[in-house]
Amino acid sequence: MIKELRQKFNADFTKEKYDAYMAKLEALHPGALDFRNAETPVFVPKDFTAKMLGACEDIIDVIVDPKFISLTDRGIPANVKVPNENSHAEFIVFDFGICENEKGELEPQLIEMQGFPTLYAFQAFHSELTAEYANLPANFSAYLNGYTKETYTQLLKEIIVGDLNPENVILLEIFPEQQKTRIDFYCTEQLLGIKTVCLTKLIAEGNKLFYDNNGTKTEVKRIYNRLIFDDLQKQES
């Protein structure tokens, strides 16, 4: 979207550079990168970034409104409701399409929004390797609102681990080794020090949960849930 950067990237692109880039991504956790990775980043100008952020803020204003839960309560099937939920999601992901309006200007159009975590740990490593591969100018970053890899990682840790010992926090999934996003599970452990545990491996004792932490039965005090109900229901059927 930034013509000068696009032209420079295209002129400098070689298959050898791309293969070397992919090799570095693969080397993060060999055999775990199970989805397509684009040959090029998208070079987003400041004005378009501002439009996307503005759209996100407008939507979030609705979500954090105290009336939102009552307005959407009937939209969630009773069998997937979780007791003691927070007032709003800690993680929200927006997918935008790049469209042209009647004036010929580019503007973002919301395709999808999900209140669920995605590749949050992997993207920290991905952004770093992509910036190196694309030879991005120093003032360009995948992080928004002044965040850096360090401050982003710290925020992620505050949300997921909080003030707990990382060994008492787990990433929960169903058959994690089979998931296409499993590289993010391994990157999460690398960044935050928390283990990935399969739902079938949890140990329930009274109202407490435990998991086998390298031979030591360890209490689970917080769960970073990556389990999608649809996947669980497929397993049950």
Where are these regions (language model features)?
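Preference for protein termini
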Residues: 1-237
